[in-house]
């Protein structure tokens, strides 16, 4: 992995459009359901499909795989796509303000019932795939899936699918009769199974002990048959499969287990999506409480996808649920994330999901959940609400955190908190795109401000359930006036009076009180809020959301201006523009309106050299001193443009190959002859291998392997 240097083009081409000479082409508003690249204005509702609503009992599994009472939470309970359709049509989701749903992986899963320690287990969760090009019949038919997409879109709801390309299903290297032997099918045609794997579709290095990143990538996750992404058949199959789901109209993809797949392959996978039909993508890289992982943030910044924001979730749980940290810890997390993430507003925030205990505990204080929901809905990032949170569902780890939703009440306070705050993401860009600043704090109280241009939202939370907080000396960016609590007092909030200079009148925040005050106004200058996708090749159309001007102006990649024909559409809240044929690398994006007023810089956009394929680079006999590692660089931006600081690595040497052989799977331009070399690094000391630059012609599709010896 690497961080690219920013490129500044040496040429500048100014685009000047005379008013009235060219009528502006209009894009959709940034809040539109058709905006598949930007979810900052959305609230996601995560649905475990089997546990939500049974809309069609006829498709329920039979026999030992099904428990209609949902007592055995490891069996199917009956939820399906028709059930989700019904809850869209009856207003349950739209009434809550939900504008995106994230559903279980829709692909066909194994049918076997597996006995683990005397307990029957099924693929109700959707993570035991057998055919990525067919649907799980327990969820519905392909027509049912299309109906779900159409119904959701008709109600202004986007659809995100879970997708797990890391593995197929449980398998045993010693027993081909166990479960379904991890078999993989291509639209019904068998490609192969885990045992007798003559085509090398899977990894066969045993189970991971999670000791290193390399160990987790190339060894099996538990007993799941780990797919070999360096196999051309697997690579092409998975990319064709995701194209099929994109063709069906999905708006986003949540990629499972990104920590456990080669990073280079995932970058080429994202390139395939972005070059085909760009949608919002985010991955799952689990982090525990206070766990620090530089690789986690590096992946978020360089892979082409966002991440589920586990540091956010874990800190919110510590502060609002467990009382193991205070508001200063919450502030530190928010401020640290501004540095750690290149684009913090793209990360998906949450307080619980199917991989952790539910936030709410049995007989716990409901106000804790309500405050955590308010915090998530008004904080930076894209909020995701786990199904049933609005009904105060509780439950420990898997499978207790995946129970059937008990009711669909629209009168719970939690439902109303979501209902009142979710619309702010579309009505106030400060919530969708704004910066975050702490305005008042002590151990139990935080007041923070979100600001985008002159749009402002101020949020106050007192987590102390027994003691009111006397708020004095609060200064905000709100104009002078009186502001009602957006929550309408349901969490004991109050009206805020603001005087000259943003100074708020002293007030008392009730025990357990939460209030939200907000102000919106028109922009006076362009301001960028979101760019998506954040990685693509020249010629791909990207979407810039924020506030600009109704009159078409100029978009810049670095100092290179886009010409008129390459500005596909222009509207006050959204611009669509084609990437110019500039050298591959990292660029700043900015917008200037017709009057010449310039926007803020949106940085870290990667222009790829071209279509991407994955190549495994292997170097033999590369002996190193203690603390020294081997890296790879070359003449394209994907290899660091010969800069040792941007070289790929450190390479691996433990699982697929062992020291002194090193290897790494890298995303490189397809169908091109590239130059490359290996080097050794220890701190700032760099030792290049000798000899001439190496060359390799990459394939136009599939994967390849380069295997060479170290040149002294």
Curated annotation (Swiss-Prot):
Annotated CBM20 domain ranges read 607-712
| Region named E | 609-712
* GO MF term set: alpha-amylase activity; cyclomaltodextrin glucanotransferase activity; metal ion binding; starch binding
**Which GO CC annotations does the UniProt entry carry?**
extracellular region
Its EC number(s) = 2.4.1.19
Where is this gene product found? Answer: Secreted
Presence of keyword Transferase: yes
What are the IPT/TIG domain coordinates in residue numbering? 526-606
Start and end residues of each stretch annotated as A2: 230-433
| Protein's name according to its UniProt entry | Cyclomaltodextrin glucanotransferase
Q: Which GO terms describe its biological process?
A: carbohydrate metabolic process
Q: Which reaction does it catalyse?
A: Cyclizes part of a (1->4)-alpha-D-glucan chain by formation of a (1->4)-alpha-D-glucosidic bond
Disulfide cysteine pairs (residue numbers): 70-77
Which portions of the sequence form the region A1? 28-165
Region listing for C, in residue ranges = 434-522
SMART domains, per the entry: Aamy (SM00642), Aamy_C (SM00632), CBM_2 (SM01065)
Gene3D superfamilies from the entry?
Glycosidases, Golgi alpha-mannosidase II, Immunoglobulins
Write out the residues that bind substrate.
127-128, 167, 220-223, 254, 259-260, 354, 398, 402
Q: Which residues form the active site?
A: 256 (nucleophile), 284 (proton donor)
Domain remark in the UniProt entry: May consist of two protein domains: the one in the N-terminal side cleaves the alpha-1,4-glucosidic bond in starch, and the other in the C-terminal side catalyzes other activities, including the reconstitution of an alpha-1,4-glucosidic linkage for cyclizing the maltooligosaccharide produced.
Family, as annotated: Belongs to the glycosyl hydrolase 13 family.
| Origin species | Bacillus sp. (strain 38-2)
Q: Provide the site residues for: Transition state stabilizer.
A: 355
Do you know which InterPro entries this protein is assigned to?
A-amylase/branching_C, A-amylase_C, Alpha_amylase, Carb-bd-like_fold, CBM20, Glyco_hydro_13_cat_dom, Glyco_hydro_b, Glycoside_hydrolase_SF
Q: Which UniProt keywords apply?
A: Calcium, Disulfide bond, Glycosyltransferase, Metal-binding, Secreted, Signal, Transferase
């Amino acid at each position: 992995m690497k961080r690219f240097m920013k490129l500044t083009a040496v040429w500048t081409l100014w685009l000047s459009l005379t008013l009235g000479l060219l009528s502006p082409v209009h894009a959709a508003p940034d809040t539109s359901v058709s905006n598949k690249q930007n979810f900052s204005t959305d609230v996601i509702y995560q649905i475990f499909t089997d546990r939500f609503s049974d809309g069609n009992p006829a498709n329920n599994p039979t026999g030992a795989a099904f428990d209609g009472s949902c007592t055995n939470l490891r069996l199917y309970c009956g939820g399906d796509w028709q059930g989700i359709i019904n809850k869209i049509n009856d207003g349950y989701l739209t009434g809550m303000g939900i504008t995106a749903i994230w559903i279980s992986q829709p692909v066909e899963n194994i049918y076997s019932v597996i006995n683990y320690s005397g307990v029957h287990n099924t693929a109700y969760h959707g993570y035991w795939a057998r055919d990525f090009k067919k649907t799980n019949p327990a969820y519905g038919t392909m027509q049912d899936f299309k109906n779900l997409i159409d119904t959701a879109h008709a109600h202004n709801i986007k659809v995100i699918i879970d997708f797990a390309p890391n593995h197929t299903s449980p398998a045993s290297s010693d027993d081909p009769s166990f479960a379904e032997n991890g078999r993989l099918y291509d639209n019904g045609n068998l490609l192969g199974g885990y045992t007798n794997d003559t085509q090398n579709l899977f990894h066969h290095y045993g189970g991971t002990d999670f000791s290193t990143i390399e160990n987790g990538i190339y060894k099996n996750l538990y007993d799941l048959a780990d797919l070999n992404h360096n196999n051309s058949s697997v690579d092409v199959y998975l990319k064709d499969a995701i194209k099929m789901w994109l063709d069906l109209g999905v708006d986003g993809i949540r990629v499972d287990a990104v920590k456990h797949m080669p990073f280079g392959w995932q970058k080429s996978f994202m390139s395939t999506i972005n070059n085909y039909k760009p949608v919002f993508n985010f991955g799952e890289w689990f982090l525990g409480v206070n766990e620090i992982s530089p690789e986690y943030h590096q992946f978020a910044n360089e892979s082409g996808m966002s991440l589920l924001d586990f540091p956010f979730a874990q800190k919110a749980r510590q502060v609002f649920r467990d009382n193991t940290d205070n508001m200063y810890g919450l502030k530190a997390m928010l401020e640290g994330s501004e540095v750690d993430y290149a684009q913090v507003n793209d990360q998906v925030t949450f307080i619980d999901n199917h991989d952790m205990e539910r936030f709410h505990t049995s007989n716990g204080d409901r106000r804790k959940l309500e405050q955590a929901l308010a915090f998530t809905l008004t904080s930076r990032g894209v909020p995701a609400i786990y199904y049933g949170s609005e009904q105060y569902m509780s439950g420990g780890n898997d499978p207790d955190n995946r129970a059937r939703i008990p009711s669909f009440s629209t009168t719970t306070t939690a439902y109303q908190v979501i209902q009142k705050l979710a619309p702010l993401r579309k009505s106030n860009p400060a919530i969708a795109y704004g910066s975050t600043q702490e305005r008042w704090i002590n151990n139990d109280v935080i007041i923070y401000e979100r600001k985008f241009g002159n749009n402002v939202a101020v949020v106050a939370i007192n987590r102390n359930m027994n003691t009111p907080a006397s708020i004095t000396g609060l200064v905000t960016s709100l104009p002078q006036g009186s502001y009602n609590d957006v929550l309408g007092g349901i969490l004991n909030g109050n009206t805020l009076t603001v005087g000259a200079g943003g100074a708020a009148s002293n007030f008392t925040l009730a025990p357990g009180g939460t209030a939200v005050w907000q102000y919106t106004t028109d922009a006076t200058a362009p301001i960028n809020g979101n760019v998506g996708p954040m990685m693509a090749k020249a010629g791909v159309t990207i979407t810039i959301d924020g506030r600009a001007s109704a009159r078409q102006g100029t978009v810049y990649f670095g100092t290179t201006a886009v010409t008129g024909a390459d500005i596909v559409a222009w509207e006050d809240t959204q611009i669509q523009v084609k990437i110019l044929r500039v050298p591959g690398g990292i660029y700043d994006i900015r917008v200037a309106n017709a009057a010449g007023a310039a926007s803020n810089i949106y940085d870290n956009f990667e222009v790829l050299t071209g279509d991407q394929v994955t190549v495994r680079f292997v170097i033999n006999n590369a002996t190193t001193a203690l603390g020294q590692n081997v890296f790879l660089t070359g003449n394209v931006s994907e290899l660091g443009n010969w800069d040792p600081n941007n070289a790929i690595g450190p390479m691996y040497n433990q699982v697929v190959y062992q020291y002194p052989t090193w290897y790494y799977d890298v995303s490189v331009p397809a169908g091109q002859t590239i130059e490359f070399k290996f080097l050794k690094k220890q701190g700032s000391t760099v030792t290049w291998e000798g000899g001439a630059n190496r060359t390799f012609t990459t394939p136009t599709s599939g994967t390849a392997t380069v295997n060479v010896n170290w040149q002294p």
